[in-house]
Amino acid sequence: MKQIKKLLVANRGEIAIRIFRAAAELDISTVAIYSNEDKSSLHRYKADESYLVGSDLGPAESYLNIERIIDVAKQANVDAIHPGYGFLSENEQFARRCAEEGIKFIGPHLEHLDMFGDKVKARTTAIKADLPVIPGTDGPIKSYELAKEFAEEAGFPLMIKATSGGGGKGMRIVREESELEDAFHRAKSEAEKSFGNSEVYIERYIDNPKHIEVQVIGDEHGNIVHLFERDCSVQRRHQKVVEVAPSVGLSPTLRQRICDAAIQLMENIKYVNAGTVEFLVSGDEFFFIEVNPRVQVEHTITEMVTGIDIVKTQILVAAGADLFGEEINMPQQKDITTLGYAIQCRITTEDPLNDFMPDTGTIIAYRSSGGFGVRLDAGDGFQGAEISPYYDSLLVKLSTHAISFKQAEEKMVRSLREMRIRGVKTNIPFLINVMKNKKFTSGDYTTKFIEETPELFDIQPSLDRGTKTLEYIGNVTINGFPNVEKRPKPDYELASIPTVSSSKIASFSGTKQLLDEVGPKGVAEWVKKQDDVLLTDTTFRDAHQSLLATRVRTKDMINIASKTADVFKDGFSLEMWGGATFDVAYNFLKENPWERLERLRKAIPNVLFQMLLRASNAVGYKNYPDNVIHKFVQESAKAGIDVFRIFDSLNWVDQMKVANEAVQEAGKISEGTICYTGDILNPERSNIYTLEYYVKLAKELEREGFHILAIKDMAGLLKPKAAYELIGELKSAVDLPIHLHTHDTSGNGLLTYKQAIDAGVDIIDTAVASMSGLTSQPSANSLYYALNGFPRHLRTDIEGMESLSHYWSTVRTYYSDFESDIKSPNTEIYQHEMPGGQYSNLSQQAKSLGLGERFDEVKDMYRRVNFLFGDIVKVTPSSKVVGDMALYMVQNDLDEQSVITDGYKLDFPESVVSFFKGEIGQPVNGFNKDLQAVILKGQEALTARPGEYLEPVDFEKVRELLEEEQQGPVTEQDIISYVLYPKVYEQYIQTRNQYGNLSLLDTPTFFFGMRNGETVEIEIDKGKRLIIKLETISEPDENGNRTIYYAMNGQARRIYIKDENVHTNANVKPKADKSNPSHIGAQMPGSVTEVKVSVGETVKANQPLLITEAMKMETTIQAPFDGVIKQVTVNNGDTIATGDLLIEIEKATD
């Protein structure tokens, strides 16, 4: 035996590392080669020396260039080369050049490479050794005509195979004559590209066989043994995916016959070194396919079940050792046995749901499995590894070994689940499905297993919550939160969270239990019998909608939920859902409003939950088909809503009937609502909104069967004296409990409530002290003390109320960026009549449009627009119409006259057009006909209830659409959300997929990210907590990307974030020339939702050209005249600023 002192591995990745380890155990120095693309690959560092093979060579050529590799070997003074598998491992010329240079090639002899490197020669060799072979051509088929001739004789199905190589390349199954020609030419072409040899041969295709290979090893002394078989039947396109040793599905007799055949072949040719003899097995028949004259990827599992190191044996055999000598110490064939079973899974960056397309990118997290009976053979599986498109997508080979196949499979599932690989897609979920499939676990699978088992692809995407959370925090840290001033994260006080035990809450029996017991009518009767006034708390909805632009997040409500359940155990209801909270949750807070409802319902089981329902607008800004309203109410009731406050923004009772019917069907409480506007004390203010008007409406609502009558004073216009008169008249006119809602903008709210209570009101809306006043509701805490000594009082726990107020006073500071400009009582409300819930939202809109400094003008314009539109009731969505028009007129310096005179050439906000089309409803005094004509520009207006014109939504079609888009099941809640807000819902899903469940983050981190050195804890599930520390942030690179270094649960993580404030290649957008009528410019900043035309297209006057959106306000840009589109400067999704050129039209000539 000649000792090998220095060994070069002509390969890369995990097999190179495997060989280095074997050599190190034999005290042999090692040399690695690498390409330019592999400079950071792990195998380079696992050798004693490593050398770049040709800086001018491509990624594959570096490992295929024989002369360059030989040069490195000579310079490094190596005396042996191991080729691994793939690349040059079966290349006869490479082995010959090694021999010529006096370098030992660790592999079979040249004649073996020659006979097995060509599949036709291999077949001939097998026939000579008397092995059964698949009927086929005697040699390569030179032309399609000869292929066709053979097919006519042999019949179908057939397999066309490349004579060279392996790995499933150059192979095609042909099942009928029509497929033959294309398959023949494709197989030849693929063979040429893969192996540099286009020769193919044809054989009979064995349908549905097992693929069994036998591991053999021979030495230079004529000794040959087999190490039993491996089952490689789990394949995709003839490439192995999972291997098992030994095969579960073979009988002992058939196993022995196959292994004997393998030995028979190799002894016949005096084979040397490691190789595998491959067979197809069908029933009790088996057929020789080929020999792989090299080490195989799956050699690991044979090593595990036999205890024999195949790679070390290869090296020692090449050095001249005897298999049965003391260096190798191989047992005699009769003494070689297997212990238990082993399974190998190849973990790759392939995406099974995208036709196994290899993914590329940076591995940002890598956590291995391990433990008893687990083996890992890793290549580029490590954190920070750049996965390129140049090489095999294999990251690591995971092998498990156990005494039984079932235990090995269980160990594999555990190990696969334990792996954490982030930054690239992997096939791990697919492999888990393979392991758990009954066909696999029984051993009753064939080479068609993957093809015939579609349930293997029922893959739930990895939650990857840690990485998604880090990416969101990184992005908001670097780029800030939309409409929040970009600044360092403030050092907020941590809110003290009072809690109440779940057992105590479970003991409460409140209005929720009363409803379940006596039903809606029973609750109404109970309310009327109460001496004290009852409370509805609005802190969870209208209070923060009015004060903080609806921005309060679910987490801050959940934190205080148990205490709220305790404090309001004697209250009537908690208003906590509906209105603007629905779309704002999706759109701005990036959380699911249904999840909020269900989580709060679970935490507060004892008090009625109340929502604001915009009648036929549901929680949207337009009318929806009747079946949408029914479905929305049905789903809301199931999720936890008990009281539906139903209103129409124009007080049109016809619009409220469908919603009332739906609520009654659901067995819930229906509040018929009158929206209060004007001033019943001042006849000069309006001859429309009189006391008689409201009494008439109340009687109409009673006739419709509503359970409770609500007065919604959305702007806080109801003065104390007016409240006394109105409530008194209504109590006389109808036999319904009366529920009053107001806003404290003027500072008169408490007195208004006192007068209403004296007049007999049954329920009032208040908020806890720190979330009350101004545009919110009056303070419940203050009202408690104000009513001391009076006959009617509040049933509430005042100490508990103070505790809630302390909590909210701290939490409110987190939302300071969304506070409105009103800092004190403001009697301007009696002039502009803006709803409290709209004030802070409109202020935010104005700021986003660059009108923050002109908000006083916006408020005045709001008043003027109201009278321009005919003095309408102003509450969502009608208030949005007035607000959109006010912003539009201030932005474009318009007044009432210019709207009438120049309106024909103006593109009005979509909500305004919709209003004048009658899509929201009919104002009590009708429309201003002149203004309607200008705004509609010939469009026809509705004259009846919009729902009568709308086709029912086909929910099953929506389900199919969403399931296709989301690649999985969808809920009824998803369906109704999409119907109400398709774009908003889709954007939310996109954000959820990108960043995960953001409602779990604490609010300061959600809005501001993290400071350097800061640590936050995020509970992502029961008993699962992420502890995240932001270590440091790099400077931006040349592309504007920053690297953020975290420690997550003590493990280093890196995330790459594009800094949007770093301009690498400035893209200056052209501006519209105001004097050029052909230039269509952006009238407001925002984004492009949809471009409807293309260059060269002929358009007509008033034809929609594109749709823009700014802060939920859509505008359709129309052609000012007939013409041809000369240029379009924007695309869907582009951000635009006021004055940006969008489209240029060449006017048509007469």
UniProtKB/Swiss-Prot annotation:
Enzyme class: ligase
Mutagenesis / variant outcome for changing Y621A: Complete loss of catalytic activity
Catalytic activity: hydrogencarbonate + pyruvate + ATP = oxaloacetate + ADP + phosphate + H(+)
ATP-grasp domain span: 123-319
Active site, per annotation: R294
UniProt effect for mutating S879A: About 2-fold loss of catalytic activity
Keywords: ATP-binding, Biotin, Ligase, Manganese, Metal-binding, Nucleotide-binding, Pyruvate
GO BP, one annotated term: gluconeogenesis
N6-biotinyllysine modifications at: K1112
Domain Biotinyl-binding, first and last residues per copy: 1071-1146
Domain (Pyruvate carboxyltransferase) ranges: 533-802
Residues carrying N6-carboxylysine: K712
Gene3D superfamilies assigned: 2.40.50.100, Aldolase class I, ATP-grasp fold, B domain, pyruvate carboxylase f1077a mutant domain
UniProt binding sites for substrate: R541, D542, A543, H544, Q545
Residue ranges constituting the Biotin carboxylation domain according to the UniProt record: 3-455
Residues the record lists as binding ATP: K119, K161, H211, E278
UniProt binding sites for Mn(2+): D542, K712, H741, H743
UniProt cross-references to SUPFAM superfamilies, sorted A to Z: Aldolase, Glutathione synthetase ATP-binding domain-like, post-HMGL domain-like, PreATP-grasp domain, Rudiment single hybrid motif, Single hybrid motif
Subunit structure: Homotetramer.
Stated name of the protein: Pyruvate carboxylase
Organism: Staphylococcus aureus (strain Mu50 / ATCC 700699)
